[in-house]
A protein has these predicted regions:
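Flexible, compositionally biased loop and terminal segments
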Residues: 1-194
Length: 194
């Protein structure tokens, strides 16, 4: 798994606008996805847009959303031809319909691919994901579908956004910081950090 971090700091060190750092981050992502596929890695999860990113300046958020749109429009067909399956995790509630449609289309186009599973964490926050899982489990208990005594770590895992996706073996944070930033808190219980 990769926390895509440090784009703004990278740009600032070079006297460039933050937007240049974000563009360079997308280029690095392309290289990482290709390398993962070339090395036979089956799953790669990227933290592309945190649910906390909405608090950034509006112009930066708008630029990041435009980058996402461009990436999907320009890269998804090539990823599909390369056998990459795209799965998006995170909340789609309150996203503009155009973004939701692009995410849905990318998943639909690539759903039968199996060379590399690219999991894109977009509008993702792990605490919110865990809260959604707890809410789903509570509803199952309330409806009688599940008893409280049956709740286990496996039941929780099966109700997360990442249900069915293996926990990461390795977590890389590209910006050099040493924090997890509300990313895959449950899933990283036994993950190595770099």
């Amino acid at each position: 798994a990769i926390i895509m971090d440090g784009n703004g700091r990278w740009a600032a060190r070079r006297g460039l606008p933050r937007s240049s750092g974000h563009k360079a981050g997308v280029d690095a992502l392309r290289r990482a996805v290709k390398a993962a596929a070339d090395f036979g890695i089956e799953y790669l999860t990227i933290y592309s847009f945190s649910s906390e990113n909405w608090s950034r300046p509006a112009a930066e958020v708008s630029f990041l959303l435009d980058l996402l749109r461009r990436f999907i429009r320009q890269d998804v067909a090539e990823l599909h031809r390369s056998g990459v399956k795209i799965t998006v995790v995170g909340s789609r509630a309150d996203l503009e319909p155009g973004i939701v449609s692009l995410l849905d289309d990318a998943e639909r186009l690539t759903r039968d691919n199996a060379k590399l599973n690219l999991i894109v964490a977009f509008n993702y926050g792990s605490r919110q994901e865990i809260a959604r899982a707890v809410s789903a489990i509570a509803k199952k208990i309330e409806s009688g579908e599940l008893s409280a005594a049956d709740v286990s770590s496996d039941v929780i895992s099966c109700n997360l956004d990442t249900a069915g996706i293996p926990d990461p073996d390795l977590l890389i944070r590209t910006g050099g910081e040493q924090r997890i930033s509300n990313f895959l808190l449950w899933q990283c219980a036994y993950t190595e950090f770099v």
